[in-house]
Design a protein with these regions (language model features):
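Short alpha-helical transmembrane segments in multi-pass integral membrane proteins
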Residues: 1-14, 68-135, 181-236, 294-359, ...
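N-terminal transmembrane alpha-helices
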Residues: 2-30, 34-35, 51-63, 67, ...
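Hydrophobic alpha-helical segments typical of transmembrane helices
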Residues: 3, 15, 27-31, 39, ...
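Transmembrane helical elements of multi-pass membrane transporters/channels
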Residues: 9-25, 129, 163, 196-200, ...
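Transmembrane alpha-helix boundary and packing residues in multipass membrane permease domains
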Residues: 14, 18, 29-30, 66, ...
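Helix-terminus/linker motif at the lipid-water interface of multi-pass membrane proteins
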Residues: 23-41, 110-117, 173-184, 244-278, ...
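Small-residue-rich hydrophobic transmembrane alpha-helices
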Residues: 40-100, 137-156, 254, 258, ...
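Short runs within selected transmembrane alpha-helices of multi-pass transporters and secretion channels
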Residues: 61, 130-149, 156-164, 189-204, ...
Length: 442
């Protein structure tokens, strides 16, 4: 019972935090759409660039999460301080370089993306303000990862809740001119986003230095930092590559749908992706909690406990995934009907949701078990399998089933199922084989 309680103590705040980020994005776009449709489109395009840049920060953050969790388990305070100080400074420097790039070359990047002239004015304002302050986001990402890896997911969630409430309030003030404020539109949204992130970063630092690590930890920047830097990259780079591979594969599949199946299939895909995300949230939350638990247990040398904890967490996530899949099947037409009354889209979407119910358990395999392997420091095997399976199996069979065999969007989903289940079974064999035991870095 204690293990399960520990899982939910970690996973529930992560679930709420991730859900709030999702809802914040929806609220931003909704309020901007009331101001100007072009403003909503411009922010969407800018956020695509910013989202890709956040993957750069994820390299250091992923390494930080694993090393901090393992050293918390090992009770190695000196190494925790060393990792924290080096990762914070590294992501700050990287974030500063990215921010400068956005200020001076943001417009160029947007133009290369194909952002039209009518959207450019809004997009330019947004990317220069939010993109120009990305160094704040890079620091915030690192601090919250450190807090989470100590097991304080509730505190991380509360920081995020406060940031999101302030962000939405600021959006409303500057979009609708509340309390006599000027109507700034996109520029106001950008200011609200940046200010909320700055305040969240300050609060996160206060919690970090008050209860977890001392300010004096920065002395380790001068004490042989190269070894720690190498460890951060050794774990972080493969983890980021895996996410990049997935993102790129999904982009290619989106293009296959647009070019071969038409607009209605693409619209249906967008709605299905949004609906399935609510099921995936459970796996993501449990997966991230699993990484923290495995990191701390392996760091403490409790390998057998880590092994069984990983399997138990996987079974819990699988239960939620199966139940979520059943709900998608039962309510498929009503769920798609929330978004559209177009009967063709509802038909395509409802059929594909039936197929998606079989995809979600496969996705759970990968999300939970890969996070477990990552927590133990085993990061090369997942990224190698990701590249082989996503491209050799997922993309190719999605095209074959969906386009060549003429099965349409459900055929695309069948290809995704093959990828997720093949990789997932490989991850399960990897976990059961315990080769990850040799990858622990403390």
């Amino acid at each position: 019972m204690e293990k399960r309680k520990s899982l939910f103590q970690l996973a529930v705040p992560i679930f709420i935090e991730t859900l709030l980020f999702m809802l914040l994005g929806i609220a931003d776009i909704f309020m901007l759409s009331q101001f100007d449709d072009r403003a909503a489109g411009a922010v969407g395009a800018s956020n695509q660039v910013i989202g890709n840049l956040n993957l750069i920060f994820a390299i250091i953050s992923a390494g930080t999460a694993v090393l901090v969790a393992q050293n918390v388990g090992a009770k190695n305070k000196r190494e925790i301080e060393r990792v924290c100080s080096i990762s914070l400074v590294m992501n700050f420097v990287i974030g500063l370089l990215v921010s400068i790039t956005m200020i001076f070359f943001g417009d160029v990047i947007l133009t290369k993306m194909g952002v039209t002239r009518s959207l450019m004015g809004y997009a330019s304002n947004y990317i220069k303000i939010v993109g120009g302050a990305l160094f704040v986001q890079s620091i915030l990402n690192t601090v919250t990862v450190i807090i989470r890896s100590h097991g304080y997911t509730r505190e991380s969630m509360l920081i995020t809740v406060g940031m999101n409430i302030l962000n939405i309030f600021g959006d409303a003030v500057f979009i609708f001119g509340l309390f006599g404020a000027p109507v700034l539109g996109v520029k106001g949204v950008a200011i609200a986003t940046t200010v909320s992130r700055i305040l969240a970063t300050i609060i996160a630092f206060i919690f970090l230095f008050k209860g977890l690590v001392p300010v004096s930890m920065f002395k380790y920047l001068y004490d042989k930092p190269v070894g720690t830097f190498k460890k951060l990259i050794k774990i972080g780079f493969p983890s980021a590559m895996e996410n990049m591979s997935y993102s790129l594969a999904q982009t290619v599949i989106m293009s296959i749908i647009l070019l071969n199946l038409g607009e209605q299939a693409y619209i249906a895909r967008t709605y299905i992706w949004t609906l399935s995300w609510f099921v995936v949230l459970f796996s993501i939350s449990i997966g991230q909690a699993n990484q923290i638990m495995i990191g701390q247990l392996t760091g403490a040398g409790k390998v057998e406990e880590a092994y069984h904890t990983g399997l138990n967490n996987f079974k819990t996530a699988m239960l939620f995934s199966v139940l979520g899949g059943i709900a998608l099947i039962i309510f498929r037409r009503k769920l798609i009907g929330i978004y559209t009354d177009n009967q063709d889209i509802i038909l395509i979407g409802s059929i594909t949701l039936i197929v998606d119910a079989f995809l979600e358990p496969g996705r759970t395999f990968n999300i939970v078990l890969i996070n477990g392997l990552r927590g133990a420091g085993d990061v090369i095997f997942p990224v190698v399998m990701a590249i082989i399976s996503m491209w050799g199996l997922g993309v190719t069979t999605a095209y074959y089933f969906g386009v060549v065999l003429g099965l349409g969007l459900p055929g695309i989903w069948m290809g995704l199922i093959l990828d997720e289940w093949f990789r997932g079974v490989c991850m399960l064999f990897r976990w059961r084989g315990k080769k990850w035991v040799r990858k622990v870095m403390v």
